[in-house]
C-alpha cells in the first residue's frame, strides 16, 4: 500500500532542510521498503516456498517455483512499452531539440525500465540530471526501494522534495557511508547520514541544481501504486505449494517400501530404529531367514 509522506507547507523552507528530518523520513520509508524488497524478490524467483521445511528431514521436499510474478510483469511491460513512445511536433511548438536530448539520454530504455518498475513495485522514479562536466541533460531510472517523494499537507498534495538514499562501500578501507540526495524545486542537498569510520555526521551541503523543478519524477502504476502481481502473491504461493506437494507425493510413491507382516525388523527397539532408518534411506532391508 502506497504511503504518503507529508510535511507542513506552512513550516517548509527549502533552504533549511536538516539531516535529522531526512533521517526520520528515511526511517519511516524503510517500513515500506521491506515490502518493496519482497515484491522484487518474487520477480527474481525468490519465493516463500524456498524456505519450506518438512518434519521428516529424509522425506522428499521439492521446492518448485513457478515464477508467475516475472511472467505477469514482463508481459504487462511488453504490452505497455513494446512500441516506444512517440513524440511529435505540433502546431504550437517545435520539439526537435527535445527529441535530440531524448535520443542522447536513450529515453526509450529509461521508459522501459520505468514501466518494469511500475509493474514490480507499483511505482517508478526517474532522475533528470546534468552529465558530469557538461550542460547536457541525461535521465535514468532509480530504485524505488531507496527513493520517495515528500508532499505538502494541502488537499492537492503538491510535491515538496524527493529523497534518494543509498550506501557507499570503500573496500580498500573497509568502511561504509550512508548518504542521501535530497532535491527540492531549486536545491540539491548532499547529506552523509552516517559513516562507519566516523559515526554520525552532520554533512548538509546545498547547491542550486538550476532545473527549476524537482528533478525526480514519480510515476504510479495506478492510484494506489499497486504492482501488477502484488495482489496475486498468495495465489503464487499456493500454486508453488500445490506443485511441490504433488511432486513430493510422486517421489514418495516411487520410494515406497514394503510393509512386513508376521515378522519383526529387530529384536530390540534400538535395533528397530536403526532398521527403520535404513528402510527410509535405502528403501531396502534384508531379513535373514
Label the predicted regions.
Residues 1-139:
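Extended, helix-rich architectural segments
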Amino acid at each position: 500500500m502506497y504511503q504518503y509522506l507529508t510535511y507542513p507547507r506552512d513550516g517548509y523552507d527549502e533552504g533549511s532542510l536538516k539531516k535529522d528530518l531526512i533521517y526520520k523520513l528515511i526511517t519511516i520509508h524503510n517500513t515500506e521498503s521491506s515490502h518493496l524488497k519482497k515484491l522484487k524478490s518474487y520477480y527474481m524467483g525468490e519465493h516463500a516456498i524456498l524456505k519450506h521445511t518438512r518434519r521428516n528431514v529424509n522425506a522428499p521436499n521439492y521446492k518448485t517455483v513457478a515464477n508467475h510474478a516475472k511472467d505477469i510483469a514482463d508481459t504487462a511491460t511488453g504490452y505497455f512499452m513494446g512500441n516506444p513512445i512517440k513524440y511529435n511536433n505540433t502546431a504550437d511548438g517545435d520539439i526537435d531539440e527535445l527529441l535530440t536530448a531524448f535520443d542522447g539520454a536513450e529515453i526509450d530504455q529509461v521508459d522501459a525500465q520505468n514501466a518494469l518498475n511500475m509493474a514490480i513495485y507499483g511505482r517508478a522514479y526517474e532522475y533528470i540530471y546534468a552529465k558530469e562536466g557538461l550542460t547536457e541533460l541525461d535521465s535514468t531510472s532509480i530504485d524505488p526501494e531507496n527513493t520517495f517523494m515528500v508532499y505538502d499537507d494541502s488537499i492537492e498534495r503538491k510535491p515538496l522534495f524527493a529523497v534518494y538514499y543509498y550506501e557507499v562501500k570503500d573496500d580498500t578501507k573497509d568502511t561504509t557511508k550512508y548518504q542521501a540526495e535530497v532535491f527540492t524545486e531549486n536545491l540539491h542537498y548532499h547529506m552523509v547520514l552516517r559513516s562507519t569510520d566516523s559515526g554520525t555526521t552532520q554533512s548538509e551541503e546545498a547547491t542550486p541544481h538550476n532545473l527549476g523543478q524537482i528533478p525526480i519524477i514519480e510515476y504510479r502504476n495506478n492510484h494506489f501504486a499497486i504492482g501488477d502481481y502484488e495482489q496475486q502473491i498468495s495465489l503464487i504461493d499456493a500454486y508453488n505449494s500445490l506443485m511441490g506437494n504433488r511432486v513430493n507425493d510422486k517421489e514418495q510413491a516411487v520410494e515406497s517400501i514394503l510393509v512386513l507382516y508376521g515378522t519383526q525388523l529387530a529384536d530390540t527397539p534400538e535395533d528397530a530404529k536403526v532398521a527403520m532408518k535404513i528402510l527410509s534411506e535405502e528403501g531396502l532391508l534384508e531379513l535373514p531367514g
